């Protein structure tokens, strides 16, 4: 870029009435300091110009090529030293940039209020202009640019991309079309736009993330892809070479209206003993996830008898504007169309009773709304799994609030169920890792649903729609049941002694014993903690390692609590 030497630039950025006619490059350090000091005095009370000037002076005196003026709430910039090559002015309140600037190779202006950019330095290699919500277009890009991050702006078009570009991150804009992609491009992140088609992919591409667009087709994929995300588009078919991608590649095709034929073909191909392709994440779709929600009170009252609907509606109208109320309304409507709702006797009454409990507890309602927040994004089995989780939330809340204070047997039964579900989640997580074509929701729900009776899981639905695509076999279920019972026999009492609801009961019903246990814990930590951590680090040869010290400290803390709370639990349950 040319040296800054126009008077209007200095007046607009420094507020000076008179300024030297010499170019910035020729001004001495004293002149720089004078200009910056005047600029600092004329700033608003919210700007941290004094700190900015301090950093500018250090940069000038040391000839440091990197200048960081981020997070200072600056609304304008003073003249900058010409020797700097990397400039970070992110997370300020700038609405424009000067037309002239140093010969930068790296520029970070993300998190400002820019609505237009000046001509960019021709030597620029890396540019970050993300999170400028009013920025709708870009100037011509420098010829040697290698990395462009323009995430979450309001861009509607992109200029021609330089051939040197290797990284392009433009998620969360308003793009409907992309220009030709450079042949060296390795990372393309363009999720959350309005794209209906994509240009041909360069073979150099390693990471392709184009989720949440309006794509109806996908061209042939580069064979060296390491990550592919095309979730939440309008794809009904996939390129044939998707199954020939490397085995280490993660592929996400969930949220697309893929035909049953396509899904069955993929499942058949990926289940072959000879398959060595990528792991593919998908979701079963029933075509309802984009339906509009209705008012919360209407969705709730539909679960109640007609003679109660007026009173229920009046109560729930008060919750219409609570966080996640809209998605909770949609969840209730989707829940009514699940297999369990249609086939399980008393299901409607069960839901109505649960809704009454939610209306009486703001804390439980808040927790439940949050649990249901993402439940309608996929198929009805996601809704069913969410219903399982909501019933768990209710029971744990009731236990913490005292429902089982006088019924230790019922609390133990609830604890056993929560323990079994936790183990099943571990088993499901391990199973997901072994599958090449997987909908995680179906795997998690399959273990709960198919073992609900044998493991006495009162919170689990008894039917699911898409068990056939879960990949969970009869042998998996037998192995899981045996593992749950074995771990329950060996681990449950230790787990229960650390369970939060059990602690809440002890605080209320065994206050003196609880206080003694807490005192014992703190005495042990005060007298033994440091030495036990030091001994553990010494034994492993990691003395002085901060990360190892944190890990050892957490282990000692858990062992201490395990010892004390297990002793207390044994005494109370004896």
UniProtKB/Swiss-Prot annotation:
<dbReference type="GO" id="GO:0006511">
    <property type="term" value="P:ubiquitin-dependent protein catabolic process"/>
</dbReference>
<keyword id="KW-0433">Leucine-rich repeat</keyword>
<dbReference type="GO" id="GO:0039604">
    <property type="term" value="P:symbiont-mediated suppression of host translation"/>
</dbReference>
<feature type="domain" description="NEL">
    <location>
        <begin position="295"/>
        <end position="574"/>
    </location>
</feature>
<dbReference type="InterPro" id="IPR032675">
    <property type="entry name" value="LRR_dom_sf"/>
</dbReference>
<dbReference type="InterPro" id="IPR032674">
    <property type="entry name" value="LRR_E3_ligase_N"/>
</dbReference>
<feature type="repeat" description="LRR 6">
    <location>
        <begin position="166"/>
        <end position="183"/>
    </location>
</feature>
<dbReference type="Pfam" id="PF12468">
    <property type="entry name" value="LRR_TTSS"/>
</dbReference>
<feature type="repeat" description="LRR 5">
    <location>
        <begin position="144"/>
        <end position="165"/>
    </location>
</feature>
<keyword id="KW-0832">Ubl conjugation</keyword>
<keyword id="KW-0843">Virulence</keyword>
<dbReference type="GO" id="GO:0051865">
    <property type="term" value="P:protein autoubiquitination"/>
</dbReference>
<feature type="repeat" description="LRR 3">
    <location>
        <begin position="105"/>
        <end position="122"/>
    </location>
</feature>
<keyword id="KW-0964">Secreted</keyword>
<feature type="repeat" description="LRR 9">
    <location>
        <begin position="224"/>
        <end position="246"/>
    </location>
</feature>
<dbReference type="GO" id="GO:0004842">
    <property type="term" value="F:ubiquitin-protein transferase activity"/>
</dbReference>
<feature type="repeat" description="LRR 8">
    <location>
        <begin position="206"/>
        <end position="223"/>
    </location>
</feature>
<feature type="repeat" description="LRR 10">
    <location>
        <begin position="247"/>
        <end position="270"/>
    </location>
</feature>
<dbReference type="GO" id="GO:0030430">
    <property type="term" value="C:host cell cytoplasm"/>
</dbReference>
<comment type="function">
    <text>Effector proteins function to alter host cell physiology and promote bacterial survival in host tissues. This protein is an E3 ubiquitin ligase that interferes with host's ubiquitination pathway.</text>
</comment>
<feature type="repeat" description="LRR 7">
    <location>
        <begin position="184"/>
        <end position="205"/>
    </location>
</feature>
<dbReference type="InterPro" id="IPR029487">
    <property type="entry name" value="NEL_dom"/>
</dbReference>
<feature type="repeat" description="LRR 2">
    <location>
        <begin position="83"/>
        <end position="104"/>
    </location>
</feature>
<feature type="region of interest" description="Interaction with target proteins">
    <location>
        <begin position="1"/>
        <end position="284"/>
    </location>
</feature>
<comment type="similarity">
    <text>Belongs to the LRR-containing bacterial E3 ligase family.</text>
</comment>
<feature type="repeat" description="LRR 1">
    <location>
        <begin position="63"/>
        <end position="82"/>
    </location>
</feature>
<keyword id="KW-1035">Host cytoplasm</keyword>
<keyword id="KW-0833">Ubl conjugation pathway</keyword>
<keyword id="KW-0677">Repeat</keyword>
<dbReference type="GO" id="GO:0000209">
    <property type="term" value="P:protein polyubiquitination"/>
</dbReference>
<protein>
    <recommendedName>
        <fullName>Probable E3 ubiquitin-protein ligase ipaH4.5</fullName>
        <ecNumber>2.3.2.27</ecNumber>
    </recommendedName>
</protein>
<feature type="region of interest" description="Linker">
    <location>
        <begin position="285"/>
        <end position="292"/>
    </location>
</feature>
<dbReference type="InterPro" id="IPR051071">
    <property type="entry name" value="LRR-bact_E3_ubiq_ligases"/>
</dbReference>
<dbReference type="Pfam" id="PF14496">
    <property type="entry name" value="NEL"/>
</dbReference>
<feature type="repeat" description="LRR 4">
    <location>
        <begin position="123"/>
        <end position="143"/>
    </location>
</feature>
<feature type="active site" description="Glycyl thioester intermediate">
    <location>
        <position position="379"/>
    </location>
</feature>
<dbReference type="InterPro" id="IPR001611">
    <property type="entry name" value="Leu-rich_rpt"/>
</dbReference>
<dbReference type="GO" id="GO:0052170">
    <property type="term" value="P:symbiont-mediated suppression of host innate immune response"/>
</dbReference>
<dbReference type="GO" id="GO:0005576">
    <property type="term" value="C:extracellular region"/>
</dbReference>
<keyword id="KW-0614">Plasmid</keyword>
<keyword id="KW-0808">Transferase</keyword>
<feature type="region of interest" description="E3 ubiquitin-protein ligase catalytic domain">
    <location>
        <begin position="293"/>
        <end position="574"/>
    </location>
</feature>
